[in-house]
């Protein structure tokens, strides 16, 4: 049972800490000598996000649909097949109509771009978070790579392993946990881009979802849904 002091602290954090505060700008700045341009988009910019990162927004809707179907709800899993085939970035709106619940409760899409013409840093540093149905904090995408340190083909641990890590995931996960505890969010979730990433996320406490979709995704090498319970 939480003591009164802990309850008051969490209440204060809930008032002070916003989802966009999870992104640790100073920790990123400390990694480089050049100037860094930051961009953060929230729920009020969902249509901008649909244009900038349509695949990520699609994944949020797909994640909600997967959880709804796997919850045992009496619904045809193929009901939104056309939206899935088209990878409709606004599929979450269709999901909301079916489940009669709000899918996206808050968004924080954070990007960092290095002001150095010698490197192409777009996509190397970003953290895309969504507070969503049913009561999860979904890490829609995460990348903390050093564009100055490319990885040789023989050293790649997975297909998208193009640069060395900045080793910033751990401190961001700590911030995510803090945000979740303050806001009574029960789980942190994500989907891997390949099976090779599973051990890395397992080392941070994530587990593969225990459902039919996750088992099938693992067997076929698709994006595997994982979760971490917040305590």
Where are these regions (language model features)?
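Non-catalytic substrate-recognition and accessory regions of acyl/acetyltransferase enzymes
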Residues: 1-164, 171, 178-189, 193-198, ...
């Amino acid at each position: 049972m939480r003591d009164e002091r802990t309850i008051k602290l969490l209440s204060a954090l809930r008032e002070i800490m916003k989802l966009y505060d999870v992104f640790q700008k100073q920790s990123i700045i400390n990694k480089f000598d050049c100037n860094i341009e930051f961009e953060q988009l929230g729920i009020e910019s969902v249509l901008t996000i649909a244009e900038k990162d349509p695949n990520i927004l699609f994944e949020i809707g797909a994640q909600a649909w997967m959880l709804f179907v796997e919850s045992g709800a009496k619904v045809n899993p193929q009901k939104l097949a056309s939206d899935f085939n088209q990878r409709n970035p606004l599929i979450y709106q269709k999901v909301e109509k079916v489940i009669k619940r709000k899918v996206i409760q808050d968004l924080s899409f954070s990007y960092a771009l290095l002001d150095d013409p010698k490197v192409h840093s777009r996509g190397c540093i970003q953290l895309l978070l969504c507070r969503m149905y049913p009561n999860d904090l979904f890490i829609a995408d995460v990348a903390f790579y050093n564009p100055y340190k490319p990885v040789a083909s023989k050293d790649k641990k997975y297909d998208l392993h193009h640069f060395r890590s900045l080793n910033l995931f751990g401190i961001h996960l700590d911030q995510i946990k803090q945000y979740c505890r303050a806001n009574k969010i029960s789980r942190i979730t994500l989907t891997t881009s390949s099976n090779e990433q599973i051990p890395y996320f397992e080392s941070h406490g994530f587990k593969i979802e225990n459902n039919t979709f996750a088992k099938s995704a693992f067997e076929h090498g698709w994006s595997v849904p994982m979760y971490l319970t917040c305590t």
